[in-house]
Amino acid sequence: MLKTTDIREWIVSLGIAEDEHVYMGKLDNKQQKSIGVYSRSSSGPPNVALGGLDYTSYDVRPISLLVHWNRSKPESEAAAYELFETIRNVSSLDIGDTHINYIRLMVPEPQDVGTDDNGVYEYVIWLDFIYQRK
């Protein structure tokens, strides 16, 4: 199973935001230059091979990343694109003890969602981790 906590640790390892600025779940008292890691709901049937789960080799974990940066649009956009490009260029990946077969970016670029109540620019990146079941 691919856990949100493990994905959070991987995002920290990319070096775009400091460890204490990468969150899971709710971003309370959001600090600038932060990245939020959220589970994302999806629709459709589950991935189950003929014969059941014993024959199913992979599963999908939908994730949403919120880049909550600062009051500078250019700097916030640059941070969001740095994260996006870093993810897009991954060539091999294990998160925790789970092998990732494929990262499917679900948006063509970071999505500008405007600013929060304090004028901090935010971007969203949706992605699916297709991972090896155990």
Language-model-derived ranges and their functions:
Residues 46-47, 71, 133-134:
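Short, cysteine-centered beta-strand-loop-beta hairpins and adjacent loop/turn segments enriched
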Residues 52-57, 116-118:
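Short, solvent-exposed beta-strand/turn "edge" segments of beta-rich domains on protein surfaces
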Residues 1-53, 90-94:
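Small/polar-rich, solvent-exposed N-terminal microdomains that initiate assembly or binding
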